[in-house]
Amino acid sequence: MPPVRPMLAKSVKGVPAADAVEGGLVYEPKWDGFRAIVFRDGDEVEIASRSTKSLTRYFPEMVAAVRELLPERCVVDGEIVVVNGDRLDFDLLSQRIHPAASRVTLLAEQWPARLVLFDLLAIDDEDLTEQPFSARRERLVAALDGVDGPVSVTRVTDDTAVAEEWFDSFEGAGLDGVVAKPLTSTYAPNGRVMLKVKHARTADVVVAGYRLHKTSTPDRPLLGSLLLGLYADDGRLQHVGVAASFTEQRREELIEELAPLVATPDDEHPWSAWQDEEAQASGRLPGGQSRWTGTKDLSFVPLRPERVAEVGYEHMEGDGDGGRFRHTARFKRWRDDREPESCTYEQLEEVARYDLADVLGAG
């Protein structure tokens, strides 16, 4: 089964009109999970990630579902998601990437994954990648007609107003935005043919530390990322994420700019217990070991929590004082007019809940 890179999307600021491109656009919900190209050839099933790495061993229940529900020989494009109550849960999904097969099996039983499909690349001996998306979509729907269970076809609309309503509402079910697809486009692996609209918000956060960049040297230290915090109701400064993606010049400047704030052993830094397992369990601190970090050096340079920055983010993962930024935040500017103590979770926009079953229920 040769590797296939999925077709990608480029970001746009708002939901484009249906006639924005020649041939027209249709819209789909943007699912927040693991992108997957799934191959089936009889009993042989392979699940490949966006970067073509194998995900098969991490989703045994998905392999069984593909054998039961997908055509005998096919290649499909979709998203693997995990449902927790009435919304998607990316944290639970991420836990699947674990070296222990016993742990993967347990998670598959407790939190079974779903496969949401949105494209059909091949069926039997027929390559569909040169056909327009409208035809591929029609073939996908026909191939899964009557299928019920953990494999489904994403819903679609050609109505811009409906897409805008989805964008506003579906975030409450854990979705990520809206994708617009040209009806006449062929399948372009690794090509940014589609358009995506994601939520964009800002927050004022406390900068309480930084990590050095991987190219940093003792003679020329370079900042890699800023460690960001928000105050919980009980007064604890919770680590909510990082801001990165600075130019090399800016990395050097930030080292000098933040030097006066570097904490000393006499300072009572709110994250001084970051290496303590009990402290990690009781509150959100930077540096917790996980399946993603492995043996990576997670140490950081602590800063007195005296400066506030405005950052851009898409959405929060988790509820209340345990929330964190789902992706790396974007540094926008310093907010020296703000007091660090004013940087609380209360400033964040609350997203109204939406019933995920409604999103999954229509193909």
Regions found by a protein language model. Give the residues of each.
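Catalytic cores of nucleic-acid ligases and guanylyltransferases
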Residues: 1-363
